Amino acid sequence: MGATAKVLVIFVALEHLGFLVMEMFYWQTSFVQKLFGVSPELAAESGFMAANQGLYNGFLSIGLMWALFTHKKDVVVFFLICVIVAGIFGAFTVKPGVFVAQSCPALLALVTYLLSASRMENKPAS
Protein backbone atom coordinates (compact mmCIF):
# COMPACT_ATOMS: atom_id res chain seq x y z
CA MET A 1 0.00 0.00 0.00
CA GLY A 2 1.25 3.45 -0.86
CA ALA A 3 2.11 6.04 1.77
CA THR A 4 -0.72 8.37 0.74
CA ALA A 5 -3.28 5.59 1.07
CA LYS A 6 -1.93 4.65 4.51
CA VAL A 7 -2.08 8.27 5.69
CA LEU A 8 -5.68 8.61 4.48
CA VAL A 9 -6.78 5.36 6.13
CA ILE A 10 -5.08 6.43 9.37
CA PHE A 11 -6.84 9.80 9.12
CA VAL A 12 -10.24 8.08 8.84
CA ALA A 13 -9.35 5.82 11.80
CA LEU A 14 -8.27 8.80 13.92
CA GLU A 15 -11.38 10.74 12.91
CA HIS A 16 -13.54 7.91 14.24
CA LEU A 17 -11.45 7.66 17.38
CA GLY A 18 -12.22 11.36 17.83
CA PHE A 19 -15.93 10.64 17.38
CA LEU A 20 -15.65 7.97 20.08
CA VAL A 21 -14.08 10.43 22.52
CA MET A 22 -16.60 13.18 21.79
CA GLU A 23 -19.67 10.93 21.86
CA MET A 24 -18.68 8.83 24.86
CA PHE A 25 -16.96 11.33 27.12
CA TYR A 26 -17.75 14.90 26.02
CA TRP A 27 -21.29 14.66 24.67
CA GLN A 28 -22.67 17.11 27.21
CA THR A 29 -20.06 19.84 26.68
CA SER A 30 -21.01 23.03 24.87
CA PHE A 31 -18.29 22.50 22.23
CA VAL A 32 -19.58 19.06 21.22
CA GLN A 33 -23.22 20.17 21.40
CA LYS A 34 -22.46 23.03 19.03
CA LEU A 35 -20.40 20.78 16.74
CA PHE A 36 -23.19 18.19 16.50
CA GLY A 37 -26.00 20.76 16.59
CA VAL A 38 -27.78 19.45 19.69
CA SER A 39 -29.33 21.41 22.52
CA PRO A 40 -28.23 20.82 26.13
CA GLU A 41 -31.63 19.20 26.75
CA LEU A 42 -31.27 16.81 23.83
CA ALA A 43 -27.67 16.05 24.85
CA ALA A 44 -28.86 15.14 28.35
CA GLU A 45 -31.61 12.89 26.98
CA SER A 46 -29.46 11.23 24.33
CA GLY A 47 -26.25 10.68 26.29
CA PHE A 48 -26.53 6.88 26.38
CA MET A 49 -27.34 6.72 22.67
CA ALA A 50 -24.38 8.97 21.87
CA ALA A 51 -22.10 6.78 23.98
CA ASN A 52 -23.36 3.71 22.11
CA GLN A 53 -22.71 5.43 18.79
CA GLY A 54 -19.27 6.42 20.02
CA LEU A 55 -18.50 2.81 20.82
CA TYR A 56 -19.38 1.78 17.27
CA ASN A 57 -17.16 4.55 15.91
CA GLY A 58 -14.39 3.11 18.06
CA PHE A 59 -14.93 -0.30 16.47
CA LEU A 60 -14.55 1.30 13.03
CA SER A 61 -11.35 3.02 14.14
CA ILE A 62 -9.81 -0.08 15.68
CA GLY A 63 -10.88 -2.21 12.72
CA LEU A 64 -9.14 0.10 10.27
CA MET A 65 -5.95 0.22 12.34
CA TRP A 66 -5.93 -3.55 12.85
CA ALA A 67 -6.44 -4.14 9.13
CA LEU A 68 -3.60 -1.74 8.27
CA PHE A 69 -1.09 -3.22 10.68
CA THR A 70 -1.92 -6.82 9.76
CA HIS A 71 -1.93 -6.00 6.02
CA LYS A 72 -5.48 -7.30 5.56
CA LYS A 73 -6.42 -5.51 2.34
CA ASP A 74 -9.95 -6.88 2.16
CA VAL A 75 -10.60 -5.84 5.76
CA VAL A 76 -9.39 -2.28 5.06
CA VAL A 77 -11.84 -2.13 2.14
CA PHE A 78 -14.66 -3.56 4.29
CA PHE A 79 -14.22 -1.01 7.09
CA LEU A 80 -13.89 1.91 4.68
CA ILE A 81 -17.12 0.84 2.97
CA CYS A 82 -18.79 0.62 6.40
CA VAL A 83 -17.71 4.21 7.12
CA ILE A 84 -18.97 5.39 3.71
CA VAL A 85 -22.36 3.71 4.20
CA ALA A 86 -22.66 5.12 7.74
CA GLY A 87 -21.94 8.60 6.39
CA ILE A 88 -24.54 8.25 3.64
CA PHE A 89 -27.12 7.06 6.16
CA GLY A 90 -26.20 9.92 8.49
CA ALA A 91 -26.58 12.42 5.65
CA PHE A 92 -30.17 11.29 5.11
CA THR A 93 -31.15 10.85 8.76
CA VAL A 94 -29.18 13.57 10.58
CA LYS A 95 -27.83 16.25 8.23
CA PRO A 96 -26.06 16.38 4.85
CA GLY A 97 -22.81 17.54 6.44
CA VAL A 98 -22.33 14.04 7.85
CA PHE A 99 -21.58 12.85 4.31
CA VAL A 100 -18.84 15.45 3.91
CA ALA A 101 -17.30 14.80 7.34
CA GLN A 102 -17.54 11.02 7.32
CA SER A 103 -18.05 9.55 3.85
CA CYS A 104 -15.82 11.88 1.80
CA PRO A 105 -12.57 11.14 3.70
CA ALA A 106 -13.36 7.40 3.64
CA LEU A 107 -14.22 7.52 -0.06
CA LEU A 108 -10.97 9.33 -0.83
CA ALA A 109 -9.06 6.78 1.29
CA LEU A 110 -10.81 3.88 -0.46
CA VAL A 111 -10.13 5.14 -3.98
CA THR A 112 -6.50 5.95 -3.13
CA TYR A 113 -6.09 2.57 -1.44
CA LEU A 114 -7.56 0.64 -4.38
CA LEU A 115 -5.45 2.55 -6.91
CA SER A 116 -2.36 1.99 -4.78
CA ALA A 117 -3.10 -1.74 -4.43
CA SER A 118 -3.70 -2.07 -8.16
CA ARG A 119 -0.39 -0.35 -8.95
CA MET A 120 1.43 -2.65 -6.54
CA GLU A 121 -0.12 -5.76 -8.12
CA ASN A 122 0.76 -4.62 -11.66
CA LYS A 123 4.32 -3.64 -10.76
CA PRO A 124 6.85 -5.84 -12.60
CA ALA A 125 9.03 -8.03 -10.42
CA SER A 126 12.63 -6.87 -10.16
Residue ranges and their predicted role:
Residues 14-18, 22-23, 35-68, 81:
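Core segments of alpha-helical transmembrane spans in multipass integral membrane proteins
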Residues 59, 100-107:
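Membrane-embedded alpha-helical segments of multi-pass membrane proteins
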Residues 65-66, 87-91, 107-111:
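Alpha-helical transmembrane segments of multipass membrane proteins
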Residues 91-100:
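Membrane-interface helix caps and helix-loop-helix hairpins in membrane proteins
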